[in-house]
From Swiss-Prot:
Belongs to the globin family. GO terms for cellular component: blood microparticle; haptoglobin-hemoglobin complex; hemoglobin complex. Residues 1-141 form the Globin domain. Heterotetramer of two alpha chains and two beta chains. CDD domains: Hb-alpha-like (cd08927). PANTHER family: HEMOGLOBIN FAMILY MEMBER, HEMOGLOBIN SUBUNIT ALPHA. It comes from Meles meles. This is Hemoglobin subunit alpha. Heme b binds at residue 87. GO terms for biological process: hydrogen peroxide catabolic process. The lineage of its organism: Eukaryota, Metazoa, Chordata, Craniata, Vertebrata. The modification N6-succinyllysine is found at residues 7, 11, 16, 40. It comes from the Eukaryota. The modification Phosphotyrosine is found at residue 24.
Length: 141
């Protein structure tokens, strides 16, 4: 459960990310593919090379979904319901991959915003991404 302090940290961090969310999403996705090659199996039709427009485009979709989630911190299941359906019923993404991408997103944010990435912010963002992952995998059961 996200505390009021977590919600404040998440919103403040996302505000600082601003227009870079799509860029960071693409970078995190590329980092995920490089660090965890098995994640590539869900994207056989993508050009997965460094700087790929397809990876950047999908990274922007990830970032847009997270931006929507940040705007609905009190109703993540409602905000992410359609995305949960897509990943559970159509794409059938292994739930572990959400944790891997979450980790890579945290690393990406820490690289770009080291001063703001305090232990408290890190913990809040980790809880947020874990909550998002839980919602996205809730319909697998």
């Amino acid at each position: 459960v996200l505390s009021p302090a977590d919600k404040a940290n998440i919103k403040a961090t996302w505000d600082k990310i601003g227009g870079h969310a799509g860029e960071y999403g693409g970078e995190a996705l590329e980092r995920t593919f490089a660090s965890f090659p098995t994640t590539k199996t869900y994207f056989p039709h993508f050009d997965l090379s460094h700087g790929s427009a397809q990876v950047k485009g999908h990274g922007k979709k990830v970032a847009d979904a997270l931006t929507n989630a940040v705007a609905h911190l009190d109703d993540l299941p409602g905000a992410l319901s359609a995305l949960s359906d897509l990943h559970a019923y159509k794409l059938r993404v292994d739930p572990v991959n959400f944790k891997l991408l979450s980790h890579c997103l945290l690393v990406t944010l820490a690289c770009h915003h080291p001063a703001e990435f305090t232990p408290a912010v890190h913990a809040s963002l980790d809880k947020f991404l874990s909550s998002v992952s839980t919602v996205l995998t809730s319909k697998y059961r």
